[in-house]
Regions:
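PLD/PLD-like phosphodiesterase catalytic module centered on the HKD motif
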Residues: 1-314
Length: 314
């Protein structure tokens, strides 16, 4: 089984439609306190609009969610009526691009996970991400996640599912995870994730395993404690980079590996290390610490969490 874990917002004005996909729940914690990551696309009837194919995919995903909705039929119908009205509105547009050209960069697409619907097949966010990347070689993999899966064997399920990615011999693996408060005088820093996952990460990347710990309160940045809740995967290659940001944790349910939540992410593709408005994909992760503040795997205590990940059905 799975849960509805996607966070998708569609805002409609007279001449503009905005799609927001992110990691934050529609709560005060999500929008005011946590460290979250959002991506927004604007659609309007001019040639510089984001291509309408992404919006249509998002509306189709919302319609799919309605299939499993347990709300009253009238509420469900209002959602379907709204997506239909948005489709009708943009159908009248004549200048907005319909899709990206084959070699156009940067480009973006919607990547979702969901269980098997009445007609069609289940969708895996990780499988789609890998299909977008292959057969390119990976020179760097960055994972930002507050949760990982609970392991039942010698391999981490998600890492094992990425085994077909061709890795450069010196590929770096960057793990951006929350830091738990340590007892006073402690010499090692605490990560509230299973020790087994840390072992699997080190096994995968060896001496090139990197860890960035994001504390709840960063000096000169935060006025109050803030939990890391953002989720992203950055794949870097020799000539191309892919950045996926949205609701998918680095867990089997989040990535759609054997078990499927309803998840939504945007995947951006660009030339390697390309700057847009002064920012690379690394910068857009928005981490509040320096990339130079990495921590040795040997200086970390991995602390098994007492509860299952938030995206696991209860």
């Amino acid at each position: 089984g799975g849960i509805q874990h996607a966070k998708v917002t569609v805002l409609v004005w007279e001449r503009l439609v905005r799609l927001i996909v992110g990691s934050a729940n529609l709560t005060r914690q999500g929008y005011r306190r946590n460290r979250e990551l959002f991506a927004a696309l604007d659609f309007f009837d001019v040639p510089i609009s984001a291509p309408l194919s992404v919006l249509r995919d998002a509306l189709a995903f919302i319609d799919t969610l309605c299939v499993w909705s347990r709300t009253l039929p009238a509420a469900n119908q209002r959602i379907r009526d709204t997506t239909g009205q948005i489709r009708a509105r943009v159908r009248r547009w004549s200048s907005a691009p319909q899709d990206f050209s084959p070699r156009e960069r940067p480009r973006v697409g919607l990547v979702v996970s969901h269980p098997t619907p009445a007609s069609g097949s289940a969708q895996s966010a990780l499988k789609q991400l890998m299909q977008m990347w292959l057969p390119r070689r990976v020179v760097g993999l960055t994972v930002m996640t507050p949760f990982v899966g609970q392991q039942t064997n010698s391999e981490d399920t998600v890492l094992h599912s990425m085994r077909d990615l061709p890795m450069a011999r010196d590929a770096e693996g960057w793990l951006i995870v929350p830091e738990a408060p340590a007892p006073e005088g402690a010499k090692r820093r605490i990560v509230p994730l299973p020790q087994h996952f840390g072992q699997c990460w080190k096994k995968r990347f060896g001496k090139n395993a990197r860890v960035l710990l994001v504390p709840m309160c960063v000096d000169e940045v935060d006025e109050r404690p803030r939990d890391l809740h953002a989720k992203a995967i950055l794949i870097e290659g020799d000539s191309h980079d892919l950045l996926m940001a949205g609701s998918s944790n680095f867990t089997p349910h989040g990535m759609g590996i054997g078990v499927f939540n309803c998840e939504a992410n945007l995947v951006f593709e660009d030339k390697a290390d390309e700057k847009r408005e002064g920012q690379t994909f690394d910068d857009r992760l928005g981490i509040p610490i320096s990339w130079d503040d990495l921590v040795s795997m040997d200086d970390i205590v991995w602390q098994d969490p007492e509860e299952a990940p938030e995206d696991a059905p209860s």
